[in-house]
Amino acid sequence: MKQYLDLMKKVLEEGTTKDDRTGTGTLSIFGHQMRFNLQDGFPLVTTKRCHLRSIIHELLWFLNGDTNIGYLKENNVSIWDEWADENGDLGPVYGKQWRAWGAADGRQIDQLSKVVQQLKQDPNSRRIIVSAWNVGELDQMALAPCHAFFQFYVADGKLSCQLYQRSCDVFLGLPFNIASYALLVHMMAQQCDLAVGDFVWTGGDTHLYSNHIEQTHLQLSREPRALPKLIIKSKPASLFDYRFEDFEIEGYDPHPGIKAPIAI
């Protein structure tokens, strides 16, 4: 994960001091790209421990089209708690847009099902895209999509994916985002009988919060370790039938976790 550590250094060295929506303040750069060859290992940060259980459960929650934190709470995942209302609802966030995008004529479009169909029937298409940035529903969302738009690409029997993330919390959020989309590529590849290729991450406003600077320096003082391996223990009937128990990470030996406050 040298790419990730290099990004942290770049933000520290080149970032502009900016105010932000949360009132915390950031060091920010605009426009950055990283590429991870998923054949080389699962891109889970090793210079601090990442809570993989939360990453897996959140992705399964997205894939189910859910927008209430009930499932997450049942599985002791608290990453969305700060944004939910008193009933646990978040409005039409990722799961709703991925699985039931509302069209002007009243249809609900299951973008992920269409992607699976496209990858199987027309893998050379340049339109294999999922968007969470539904302009007509942004005001109803508890939090506008940060990882907003992603595209799949097939070449030489390998499935790659590029994500555009409009806003990126480099210290807390980005390790989750990288691992989550890498996991999605593995799942999608398995369903479509493809090997995994690259995960390409592209960031817009890419920032370190001012109250994460000390933690960032600590993380940069650590040597990265070998990447773990993802094992998917079974192949369910569809992309939407995976369970938490289907996944295993082998060889994950991270440095200790580093706590930092979340900006709301």
Swiss-Prot record:
Molecular function in Gene Ontology: thymidylate synthase activity
InterPro entries reported for this sequence: Thymidate_synth/dCMP_Mease (IPR045097), Thymidate_synth/dCMP_Mease_dom (IPR023451), Thymidate_synth/dCMP_Mease_sf (IPR036926), Thymidylate_synthase (IPR000398), Thymidylate_synthase_AS (IPR020940)
Localization per Swiss-Prot or TrEMBL: Cytoplasm
Enzymatic class: transferase
Active site, renumbered: 146 (nucleophile)
Residues that, per the record, bind (6R)-5,10-methylene-5,6,7,8-tetrahydrofolate: 51, 169, 263
EC number(s) reported in the record: 2.1.1.45
GO BP of this protein: dTMP biosynthetic process; dTTP biosynthetic process; methylation
Keyword check for Acyltransferase: no
Catalytically driven reaction(s): dUMP + (6R)-5,10-methylene-5,6,7,8-tetrahydrofolate = 7,8-dihydrofolate + dTMP
Domain of life: Bacteria
Transmembrane segments: none
Pathway entry: Pyrimidine metabolism; dTTP biosynthesis
Record keywords: Cytoplasm, Methyltransferase, Nucleotide biosynthesis, Transferase
Gene Ontology, cellular component aspect: cytosol
Positions bound to dUMP: 21, 126-127, 166-169, 177, 207-209
Subunit record text: Homodimer.
Function of the molecule: Catalyzes the reductive methylation of 2'-deoxyuridine-5'-monophosphate (dUMP) to 2'-deoxythymidine-5'-monophosphate (dTMP) while utilizing 5,10-methylenetetrahydrofolate (mTHF) as the methyl donor and reductant in the reaction, yielding dihydrofolate (DHF) as a by-product. This enzymatic reaction provides an intracellular de novo source of dTMP, an essential precursor for DNA biosynthesis.
The family this protein is said to belong to: Belongs to the thymidylate synthase family. Bacterial-type ThyA subfamily.
HAMAP family, A to Z: Thymidy_synth_bact
Name of the featured protein: Thymidylate synthase
Native source species: Yersinia enterocolitica serotype O:8 / biotype 1B (strain NCTC 13174 / 8081)
Species classification: Bacteria, Pseudomonadati, Pseudomonadota, Gammaproteobacteria, Enterobacterales
